UniProtKB/Swiss-Prot annotation:
Its main location: cytoplasm. Its EC number is 6.1.1.22. One of its GO terms (cellular component) is cytoplasm. It catalyses: tRNA(Asn) + L-asparagine + ATP = L-asparaginyl-tRNA(Asn) + AMP + diphosphate + H(+). It is found in: Cytoplasm. GO terms for biological process: asparaginyl-tRNA aminoacylation. CDD domains: AsxRS_core, EcAsnRS_like_N. This is Asparagine--tRNA ligase. Pfam families: tRNA-synt_2, tRNA_anti-codon. One of its GO terms (molecular function) is asparagine-tRNA ligase activity. InterPro entries: Aa-tRNA-synt_II, aa-tRNA-synth_II, aa-tRNA-synth_II/BPL/LPL, Asn-tRNA-ligase, Asp/Asn-tRNA-synth_IIb, NA-bd_OB-fold, NA-bd_OB_tRNA. Belongs to the class-II aminoacyl-tRNA synthetase family. It comes from Shewanella halifaxensis (strain HAW-EB4).
Length: 466
């Protein structure tokens, strides 16, 4: 007797006539006049539930089987048989069924067998994994996570665990969550009346990280090729479908590399991940194509087969100015491109993924390498049809004097970045990397447009439930 997953049965791992046990939850029950019940049981291992054909001669048929409703947990034992119905090759002739847990009040069970709005499910994040859509998102998210680790491992990268608590603001934006154990009712004060953070747990003002990049650079400048993959935090008071206060970032960093190397790495990684999900999670993608985004599969296939276009920011501005599109935000040199501009370039002008390079220095971070023109930096954004920016990256400034000048320009303290400056003092080397917002990637693959629906427990302004 083998305890197995539903996915293994559908893969054909068990011959017709095999005795197996499947454990999971009831999605639906249908009773026939012939005294047979049909149970759809899922365990999360794949999109489709397996059908269990339950005869009325089981000893618990009347007092338990006929009381099963959506959400009840069961252990189902029986024989693998060919399914005469459409939609799946196998089903189970059940010889034993154990009810592990009933749903207390089926009439008030929030996840009863009916379709709910995605907004309703967001309020029940602890139960929404039981639905088709969130279960499919979770499997795709897992597939993409595994593909990312596999890609970098195959390329010889070392995964580095960067700290979640930091005293550095990577973006220089100041939108950070403060970490403190000070008593809010009795804050220590300096002679000037400001909060005395020397009395705090870390002896200085500390925050949740907005990026692992600066820390990753230190390891890239010793181990050559590294990447981080972990949570990051932004205290940005934006209540939109594109923003989260807590999200995951993938950040590779490569020594002896320039901006073109980073762009090639981004292209290779995205195509690798999309190929993986097309091969491994076809069942879930077919659901998304049917219910969420009809081009879900075709879009990924087109992406994988596309050559990335490359264009300078200055040329992109000229293209946007020359087009007859009525943009909400005016286009002029020096602006940070908005989503509408990004999507026009990727979807209408190039009709392919686009790498926009060499942005004005005044709209980019201090650590990005200053170009010879003195006006732009070696920064890039990867724009994807259907979503816009999906990756942002740069070649890092490896020249200490130029880095110091940029810090001064942006009124940042050399003292705060002493360790980062040391990398330029002791065997400096050109290096480059990028950041991929993982939830944005999951959103792109699934077609689920609100980023709060592609992370298990979303954190956003005024919302930290569960």
């Amino acid at each position: 007797m083998s305890i197995t997953s539903v996915a293994s049965v559908f893969k054909g791992d068990f011959a017709i006539g095999s005795q197996i046990t499947v454990r999971g939850w009831v999605r639906s029950r249908r009773d026939s006049k012939a005294g047979i019940s049909f149970l759809a049981v899922y365990d999360g291992s794949c999109f489709d539930p397996i059908q269990g054909v339950v005869p009325n001669n089981l000893e618990n048929y009347t007092n338990e089987v006929l009381k099963l409703t959506a959400g009840c947990s069961v252990v189902m034992t029986g024989e693998v048989v060919e399914s005469p119905g459409k939609g799946q090759a196998f089903e189970m002739q059940v010889t034993k069924l154990e009810v592990v847990g009933f749903v207390e009040d089926p009439d008030t069970y929030p996840m009863a067998a009916k379709r709910h709005s995605i907004e309703y499910l967001r309020e029940l994040a602890h139960l929404r994994p039981r639905t088709n859509i969130i279960g499919a998102v979770a499997r795709v998210r897992n597939c993409l996570s595994q593909a990312i680790h596999r890609f970098y491992n195959e390329q010889g990268y070392i995964w580095v665990s960067t700290p979640l608590i930091t005293a550095s603001d990577t973006e220089g934006a100041g939108e950070m969550f403060r970490v403190s154990t000070l008593d809010l009712e009795n804050l220590p004060r300096t002679d000037k009346g400001t909060v005395d953070y020397s009395e705090d747990f870390f002896g200085k003002e500390s925050f949740l990280t907005v990026s692992g990049q600066l820390n990753a650079e230190t390891y890239a400048c010793a181990l050559s090729k590294v990447y981080t993959f972990g949570p990051t935090f932004r205290a940005e008071n934006s209540n939109t479908s594109r923003h989260l206060a807590e999200f995951w970032m993938v950040e590779p960093e490569v020594a002896f590399a320039n901006l073109d190397d980073a762009a090639k790495l981004a292209e290779d990684m995205l195509k690798y991940c999309f190929k993986a999900v097309l091969e491994e999670r076809r069942d879930d993608l077919e659901f998304f194509a049917q219910r969420v985004e009809k081009t879900a599969i075709e879009r990924l296939e087109a992406f994988v087969s596309s050559d990335f276009a490359q264009i300078d920011y200055t040329d992109a501005i000229e293209i946007l100015k020359a087009c007859d599109k009525d943009f909400e935000y005016d286009v002029e040199w020096g602006i940070d491109l908005h989503s509408e501009h990004e999507r026009y370039l990727a979807e209408e002008h190039f009709k392919a993924p686009v790498v926009v390079k060499n942005y004005p220095k005044d709209i980019k971070a201090f650590y990005m390498r200053l170009n010879d023109d003195g006006k732009t930096v070696a920064a890039m954004d990867v724009l994807a049809p259907g979503i816009g920016e999906i990756i942002g990256g740069a070649q890092r400034e490896e020249r200490l004097d130029v880095l110091d000048a940029r810090l001064a320009e942006m009124e940042l303290s050399q003292e705060d970045y002493w360790w980062y400056r040391d990398l330029r003092r002791y065997g400096t080397v050109p290096h480059a990397g990028f950041g991929l917002g993982f939830e944005r990637l999951v959103s792109y693959v699934t077609g689920v447009s609100n980023i709060r629906d592609v992370i298990p427990f979303p954190r956003s302004p005024k919302s930290a439930n569960f």
